[in-house]
From Swiss-Prot:
The lineage of its organism: Eukaryota, Metazoa, Chordata, Craniata, Vertebrata. Disulfide bonds: none annotated. The keyword Secreted applies. Keywords: Amidation, Neuropeptide, Secreted. This is Ranatachykinin-B. It comes from Aquarana catesbeiana. Tachykinins are active peptides which excite neurons, evoke behavioral responses, are potent vasodilators and secretagogues, and contract (directly or indirectly) many smooth muscles.
């Protein structure tokens, strides 16, 4: 999931 990587940065 694309957003999963986004949250990983957070």
């Amino acid at each position: 999931y694309k957003s999963d990587s986004f949250y990983g940065l957070m």
